[in-house]
Amino acid sequence: MAATVGVSLKRGFPAAVLGRVGLQFQACRGAQTAAAAAPRIKKFAIYRWDPDKTGDKPRMQTYEVDLNKCGPMVLDALIKIKNEVDSTLTFRRSCREGICGSCAMNINGGNTLACTRRIDTDLSKVSKIYPLPHMYVIKDLVPDLSNFYAQYKSIEPYLKKKDESQEGKQQYLQSIEDREKLDGLYECILCACCSTSCPSYWWNGDKYLGPAVLMQAYRWMIDSRDDFTEERLAKLQDPFSVYRCHTIMNCTQTCPKGLNPGKAIAEIKKMMATYKEKRALA
């Protein structure tokens, strides 16, 4: 008698064949699970300095993070280190969405936001993290932005009207075309990535306003609702406020929002030339 072969009701495959396939599938899944469970250790070398500790000097401290148990962004790794490894690690962070600019720092040689910079998954490379360059450091990855904000305040970054009699009583309208002129300017989040990547700002940060502040100055200069364009230009009539920009363009390259501060500064220079000509003829 012929041997009886079990047949599956699904497409008529012999049960023995399906059994072997099932075993192979289970073995494959087991291998994948084992591979997924294997630690993926990434090293982070992070700048550390605590001024409250007597004799403490700036140093780099290395931490190890299993990328299988960490989110994809550098900020995820920093939070994991602080929560699970070293609670003394200090850094700024807030929105985690690239909106607030709090977590600006220098990662692998470039200024960016830790919340939007993906972790380099090459495990053979050590990711190096520093505070924003050429700034006084408060602690670890926290720079002192006091001068930066004071410069921002100095440009009076708000709408100014010469006739304030209607203030609060009517809307200040502008055309769609005039509103579109502000695109690429108002989106600045004041993270200071651009200013702290600028060599001119490194050496003249006390006098040169820097890319971020100048871009915001330009934003208010060209706002059709503002009445103080000439006064804003007059405040920049010195050798340092604007003219320390040498179009190196580090600012545009590093901006995490994809803005172009270098172009805005060039436009201010053109406005300054026209302003000087008008003053000479007056």
Swiss-Prot record:
Q: Give the E.C. number(s).
A: 1.3.5.1, 1.1.5.-
Residues bound to [4Fe-4S] cluster are C188, C191, C194, C255
Q: Where does [3Fe-4S] cluster bind?
A: C198, C245, C251
What range is the organelle transit peptide?
1-30
The keyword Electron transport belongs to this UniProt entry's keyword annotation: yes
Give the first-level EC class, as a single word. oxidoreductase
Q: In which pathway does it act?
A: Carbohydrate metabolism; tricarboxylic acid cycle; fumarate from succinate (eukaryal route): step 1/1
Pfam families from the UniProt entry: Fer2_3, Fer4_17
What's a single GO CC term here?
nucleoplasm
Biological process terms in GO annotation: mitochondrial electron transport, succinate to ubiquinone; proton motive force-driven mitochondrial ATP synthesis; succinate metabolic process; tricarboxylic acid cycle
As its record notes, the protein acts as a catalyst of: a quinone + succinate = fumarate + a quinol; (R)-malate + a quinone = enol-oxaloacetate + a quinol; (S)-malate + a quinone = enol-oxaloacetate + a quinol
Q: How does it sit in the membrane?
A: Peripheral membrane protein
List ligand-binding residues for a ubiquinone: W203
- Region (Interaction with SDHAF1) spans which residues? 148-220
This protein's UniProt keywords: 2Fe-2S, 3Fe-4S, 4Fe-4S, Acetylation, Electron transport, Iron, Iron-sulfur, Membrane, Metal-binding, Mitochondrion, Mitochondrion inner membrane, Oxidoreductase, Transit peptide, Transport, Tricarboxylic acid cycle
Activity control, as annotated, is: Enol-oxaloacetate inhibits the succinate dehydrogenase activity.
Task: Output the InterPro entries linked to this UniProt entry.
Answer: 2Fe-2S_ferredoxin-like_sf, 2Fe-2S_ferredoxin-type, 2Fe2S_fd_BS, 4Fe4S_Fe-S-bd, 4Fe4S_Fe_S_CS, Beta-grasp_dom_sf, Helical_ferredxn, SDH/FRD_Iron-Sulfur
Its protein name is: Succinate dehydrogenase [ubiquinone] iron-sulfur subunit, mitochondrial
Q: State the organism of origin.
A: Mus musculus (Mouse)
- Phylogenetic classification of the source organism: Eukaryota, Metazoa, Chordata, Craniata, Vertebrata
